[in-house]
Design a protein with these regions (language model features):
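Short beta-strand elements that form the blades of beta-propeller/WD-repeat-like
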Residues: 40-63, 91-110, 154-168, 176, ...
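Bacterial Sec-dependent N-terminal signal peptides
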Residues: 1-24
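Long, internal scaffold/assembly segments composed of regular secondary structure
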Residues: 208-212, 216-217, 228-358, 362-369
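Loop/turn-rich, solvent-exposed surfaces of beta-rich toroidal or solenoidal domains
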Residues: 36-37, 219, 277, 295, ...
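Conserved blade-ending motifs and adjacent loop-strand segments that build the rim/top face
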Residues: 250-263, 311-335, 399-447, 483-487, ...
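A short helix->beta-strand "capping" segment at the edge of beta-propeller domains
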Residues: 18-37, 74-75, 130-131, 324-333, ...
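Beta-propeller blade signature
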Residues: 64-67, 114-125, 171-184, 230-246, ...
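Blade-loop segments of beta-propeller domains
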Residues: 30-33, 69-111, 132-142, 191-212, ...
């Protein structure tokens, strides 16, 4: 009997560590022995070591793993003294051209500056600290927001700050593109007069750095023209091209009769840039409807700033029928503005596939006081609208991934408030779920899209009760993360017909993937993180040829 128990445990461990969903393999390493929280960010691989950031309540840890086996190596508490009387807030963990950096921010009360720091890590040690961007702000409450992202090839790292000075009535964004030595390749700032009284709205919508080192920023703006009694709605692309010594190039597109609710950038072949987002119609009085009519796509050559085409694709009857019912769809009713574009995929034909997910967050009533207050937060992550656009931006096909996911977490001393917003200024560029809310459940929501060899596959977590379900009318809501199983939805590239694949074998308490905690290795593979009541594991998701 003493020999039998270890053998049985080994067999269970092997079955727990591997799962197959159609042609998708999910291979996990050993259960992580460390109890230092849950991984909230996978930065990537360097010298056969995977670097990750873990969180437990308000504490953060640097964790390392063997890149070959995905097995746990080490965990170190990230603890820092106050700087100029202010606490340091961990923002990101990134690998830039083989160097590992921990990114932090802090407010300097005396200097009235908001600062972004980069701490270089070698092994498990911090070897130096650099202030990469410092911005003058009004006060701590109006310090604005930092947005940050590595370049497509991970050779550069971009830091941007967006804020409003109410006294001067000025909106300002500042950017700094860094190399691996934390030297600024390009640094710039932009100011505009901003007056809330004129119903002026501004959104810092997206920021990207492509493989050429070009910085591309999308903003949307809406304001009321009292003389013309209408709303002015603009999309503006700010481009800093490496081939032109980062001389700024601005392209503004004015939308007639429509309002852009958001905007994301997607670069495809032949220097074509797609500015894609949701739009709503304008009422007769010039105000925007509180609904989403469809998806727009503005295509242009970003190297010259030439606009090629503006296209507005209303959601089809078949899509709306699944989401709001046949009766309302026949009446031409539109969708509520609770959808967020979570992923953009370049098609082999030069078009773009857009994944738009329903996300509604409810903040409950807090119990307790101050930093000891506990706030219940419910995340509702439901259906995903899949829209395939042609190269010119017109609609090719669309469909709906049926799912209903709900997670409720209790956060200590946390409030959603107006994070990322200042008055009528919003910042939608950035993380889907902030690091401060990951680790307790929201990371199990959403999806992992894989586009390989001209075919789209989307991995989501679902309840075993929904096995075989492909329509919204029949889907059952999944609330328990420990009952979730990974399933795959695939689409016919020509017609958009949806197929569902469920795992043929799974345990009752099967490990579930955390889509918000992943790192893309190739077009068909991700480093992933999963968990169940048995424990958590790092692994790899591979879409087989």
């Amino acid at each position: 009997m003493r020999k039998f128990i270890p053998l049985l445990f080994l067999i269970c461990s092997i079955s727990f560590a591997q799962l197959k969903v159609g042609n998708v393999d999910l291979n996990f390493g050993d259960i992580i022995e460390s109890k230092d929280g849950n991984i909230v960010k996978i930065a990537g691989k360097n010298n056969n070591v995977i670097y990750a950031l873990a969180r437990s309540k308000k504490k953060f840890f640097l964790q390392t793993f063997d890149a070959s086996t995905k097995n746990f190596k080490n965990s170190s508490l990230l603890k820092f003294d106050k700087l100029n009387g202010s606490k340091l807030q961990i923002e990101d963990l990134a690998i830039v051209e083989g160097k590992v950096f921990l990114m932090l921010s802090y407010y300097d009360k005396k200097a009235k500056t908001y600062n972004f720091l980069a701490k270089e890590i070698q092994g498990n040690e911090i070897v130096n600290t650099t202030n990469v961007l410092s911005v003058d702000v009004e006060n701590k409450k109006k310090k604005g927001t930092f947005v940050f992202t590595p370049s497509f090839d991970e050779v550069n790292y971009l830091v941007a700050h967006v804020g409003v000075n109410d006294k001067k009535k000025v909106l300002k964004y500042s950017i700094s593109l860094l190399d691996s030595n934390l030297k600024s390749v390009v640094k710039d700032s932009y100011e505009a007069v901003f007056d809330k009284k004129n119903r002026q709205y501004f959104d810092f919508s997206d920021v990207q750095v492509n493989e050429h080192g070009d910085v591309l920023i999308a903003t949307t703006e809406s304001y009321r023209d009292k003389k013309k009694k209408t709303n002015i709605n603009n999309i503006t692309i700010h481009a800093y091209l490496a081939s032109k010594s980062y001389e700024k190039q601005v392209t503004s597109i004015s939308l007639s009769g429509k309002r852009a609710l958001n905007c994301s950038l997607m670069e495809t072949k032949d220097n074509t840039l797609h500015a894609i987002g949701f739009y709503s119609d304008l009422k007769k009085n010039g105000k925007a409807e509180f609904t989403v009519e469809g998806i727009y796509d503005v295509t242009f050559d970003y190297t010259t700033g030439t606009v090629n085409k503006e296209t507005f694709n209303a959601f089809t009857y078949d899509v709306k029928k699944q989401l709001i019912g046949e009766r309302r769809a026949k009446k031409g009713k539109n969708l509520k503005p609770f959808y967020k574009n979570i992923s953009f995929v370049e098609r082999e034909n030069g078009g773009v596939i857009v994944l738009s997910e329903y996300l509604f967050v409810v903040e409950g009533k807090s119990t307790g006081f101050g930093p000891l207050a506990i706030t219940p937060i419910t995340y509702n992550s439901n259906e995903i609208i899949v829209t395939a656009l042609k190269k010119d931006g017109t609609l090719d096909w669309s469909n709906v991934i049926p799912k209903e996911q709900q997670v409720t977490v209790s956060e200590l001393g946390f409030s959603l408030g107006l994070a990322g917003a200042s008055g009528a200024v919003t910042v939608t560029a950035g993380l889907y779920f902030p690091l401060t809310v990951l680790g307790n459940g929201p990371e199990y929501l959403s999806a992992i899209p894989i586009y390989h060899n001209g075919a789209l596959t989307v991995i989501v977590n679902d309840d075993p009760k929904n096995i075989g379900i492909t329509t919204m009318d029949d889907v059952k809501k999944v609330r328990n993360i420990y009952k979730m199983i990974p399933v795959a939805f695939s689409f016919d590239e020509t017609t958009g017909k949806l197929s569902r694949t469920d795992p043929t074998e799974f345990e009752k308490k099967q490990i579930a993937v955390r889509p918000s905690t992943k790192y893309r290795k190739d077009s068909n593979s991700y480093i992933i993180y999963g968990g169940s009541k048995k424990g958590n594991c790092l692994g790899e998701l591979i879409l087989n040829e």
